[in-house]
Amino acid sequence: MNIQTLLNQRIQAAMVAAGASDTAQALVRQSAKVQFGDYQANGIMGAAKALKMNPCDFAQATLDKLDLSDLAEKVEIAGPGFINIFLKNVWLSKELTQLRTSERLDVNPVDAPETVVVDYSSPNLAKEMHVGHLRSTVIGDAVVRTLEFFGHHVVRQNHVGDWGTQFGMLLAYMERLRSENATISMALSDLETFYRAAKTCFDEDEAFATRSRELVVALQSGDEECLALWDEFINISLTHCEETYKMLGVSLERQHVMPESAYNDDLANVVNELKEQGLLQESNGAQCVFMEEFANKEGEITPIIVQKTGGGFLYATTDLAAVRFRQHTLNANRVLYFVDARQSLHFQQIFTLSRKAGFVKPETQLEHMPFGTVMGSDGKPFKTRSGGVAKLSSLLEEAQERAYQLVASKNPEMDEEELRNIGRVVGIASVKYADLSKNRTSDYVFNWDSMLSFEGNTAPYLLYAYSRVASIVKRSEIDVVNLTGEISIDEPQERALAVKLCQFEEAIQQVANDGMPHFLCAYLYDLAGTFMTFYEACPILNAEDEVKHSRLQLALNTASTLKLGLSLLGIETLERM
């Protein structure tokens, strides 16, 4: 049940019946303060202005056409034309009963599912995944899980970088190791070391650099031996990625990899189509597209280069081919790109050109979902203590160890196996949640102490809240199957919890619509806090049976909502901590 959507529909219909245009919006929002009701409609003033009416008069005209008697106790006009809605306790009770009996918490799949292509993670295979890959991977995965929960057909696309001039350097180094009878798989066990060694040879050995350039040409020409070496490198690199994905608990698998090289055969076709449409212009021997939409104040245009002077193709060409593939082969209705904010201009150009060239249908949504940078305490991009790039796998291992030490110090009586498992869950959850709980578009500072804290909007706090609710239900020694009585809402803390529980769908809808998991994180944090306030004010286990059963159902609903919400974020829960 999405209360906000329901109220928007009804109030908008009443506004139209009162004389507003069909495009008038009710703009229903959750009320910031209880004295303003549970929801507030803020669209009256805009509609009244268009009608040249007094806002309060139009608000009254809207109320005359509005019937919310089935769900609202009171509907009132406030201030210059706001409409405040106070929900009925009996209606809330009925909704909570439906939540109790629904595995999906009464969230229905969408009526018209879409094919949504989601491009996320997408590391370059020349190096191991590092902290810079964290945001795209965990944010993209949370959005994918949420879209699938709503019933959309989601196509994961891990657009890994497996092509380009740097691979000639890497292949030359692999070739040298093989000639020296070194074991390549062992050398590749640390991709960072391998890459640095190859780069050193390239910078210091002219013969090696020449051989690297030759191998780039051979690779692009389809040389079998060169392709075999390249394929071995790619396979080992992807195995590293898969190990990190497994540790991180994201849903990406080998089958979701759609590398840059997959589009190679189509790149010339892309250039030819642009040429046939008269969109290309030669500039210093390169094939470029100049679009007036991207002119600066001086009228200078930053072009999209789709083919270099020597005939080589660029990232832009590959991205254009990917757009065509996602539209015409995958039949996407919507394509989401979870890529660094620094690529914003690039994607604006790609999307605009794709539409000019007819690579996508007019109704297909192409959406860049930019994100900020993970920063260190010095205000610069996060590095290791030695100043190097932080490998993601090492970071996750450290998170698990730190969480293990923290939990072990609080629970010395637990056996080692359970402590290690709790350390794993809490450690990984802490890193993911610290990222997911921040506004996607903002930078944030990576800080072990804050992310592993049991206070505030953190994973440890939410995991503890869930385990505490679960333990309350367990200690009641009542079979939850028998908890079928009416849920009573008598105390203000019961009511606050009831309203918050009924707002779950609104939170996850924002994730699906806007690609912003922090809305769900904020909701879960508010829910946990609302439950704690309820639990302190409203005894459960010591209450009379009828009250106990009612409050246990509120607790069960809370546990179910926390568990499902965290699972949509890709975070495991623990029954005990």
From Swiss-Prot:
A motif ('HIGH' region) lies at residues 123-133. InterPro entries: aa-tRNA-synth_I_CS, Arg-tRNA-ligase, Arg-tRNA-synth_N, Arg-tRNA-synth_N_sf, ArgRS_core, DALR_anticod-bd, Rossmann-like_a/b/a_fold, tRNAsynth_Ia_anticodon-bd. It is found in: Cytoplasm. Keywords: Aminoacyl-tRNA synthetase, ATP-binding, Cytoplasm, Ligase, Nucleotide-binding, Protein biosynthesis. One of its GO terms (molecular function) is ATP binding. CDD domains: Anticodon_Ia_Arg (cd07956), ArgRS_core (cd00671). It catalyses: tRNA(Arg) + L-arginine + ATP = L-arginyl-tRNA(Arg) + AMP + diphosphate. One of its GO terms (cellular component) is cytoplasm. It holds the Pfam family DALR_1. One of its GO terms (biological process) is arginyl-tRNA aminoacylation. Its EC number is 6.1.1.19. The keyword Nucleus does not apply. NCBIfam families: argS. Belongs to the class-I aminoacyl-tRNA synthetase family. PANTHER family: ARGININE--TRNA LIGASE, CYTOPLASMIC, ARGINYL-TRNA SYNTHETASE. Monomer. This is Arginine--tRNA ligase. It comes from Marinomonas sp. (strain MWYL1). The gene is argS.
